[in-house]
Amino acid sequence: MKIYTFGAENAPVILLLPGTCCHWKGNFGHVIPLLTESFRVLCVSYDGFDETETTEFPTMIEETEKIEAYIQENCGGHIRAAYGCSLGGSFVGLLAARRNIHMDYGILGSSDLDQASAFTAKLQTNLLLPMIYPLIRDGQFKSRFLQKQMEKRAAEMGDYVKAFMGMFGGARPYVTKQSCKNQFYSDLITPPPDKIDIPGTEIHIFYALKMGEKYRARYEQHFANPVIHEQDLQHEELLACYPEQWAALVKQIAEGNENEVQN
């Protein structure tokens, strides 16, 4: 695992955590410059997904431990905020609940927080991986049907599908199938605890309403008092398609400007 740093060393720290099988630049490369005016930005590049390393993703807990160790060693165990894109939101929940480091603000970006039994998780992973892994490795689906469906959706939905696919980071032949498998499976069997309530930590959730109503209940299940920002958008559409608005909202939250924060 690597953590890339940007901005002034004495600025408040914001930690960025990528989504499932995503490259850190694909997720956050376009917004990091918008944050470095105010923050020292730390961007995680997970084991198995960084082109400069020969590693494989282990488990959610092992990766969380590495993130905690870095924050303890380099930030005195305290950061201003953490933003998790999709899967990254699971890390935000785990980091908050484990209490080995402290964050003033934890922000989940459209995270689904899906969970399953070990048996079901293994089944889902084994079904999904043959479809998704070629996209990670080659930058496109192996199945002509899936590729055509994706192109059709892109034509129907405009910039969103193109921007969303770009968040994966293009073809990455160095990513192993085992890393993808470990990340899918481990995320499903490692849910955050229920009713997380940490003194001094505010949890904010970017709730993409077009994902469906069930996610509101899920957020309220796992967090005792989440601040839910309703957005009439698709999964991580704010980050993918509206970077200036995303950065403005993240900065308002992390700077504690509650009266300026708009849902």
Each language-model region and where it sits:
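Conserved HGGG/HGGXW glycine-rich cap/lid loop of the alpha/beta-hydrolase fold
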Residues: 4-53
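Active-site loop/oxyanion-hole signature of alpha/beta-hydrolase fold enzymes
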Residues: 42-81
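Short beta-strand immediately N-terminal to the catalytic nucleophile in serine-hydrolase-like folds
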Residues: 82-84, 109
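Gly/Ala-rich beta-loop-alpha elbow adjacent to hydrolase catalytic centers
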Residues: 84-92
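Flexible "cap/lid" loop of the alpha/beta hydrolase fold
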Residues: 97, 105-136
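Conserved alpha/beta-hydrolase catalytic His-Asp/Glu region
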Residues: 117, 139-196
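Conserved serine/cysteine hydrolase catalytic core
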Residues: 178-221
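Catalytic histidine-centered segment of alpha/beta-hydrolase-like enzymes
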Residues: 233-246
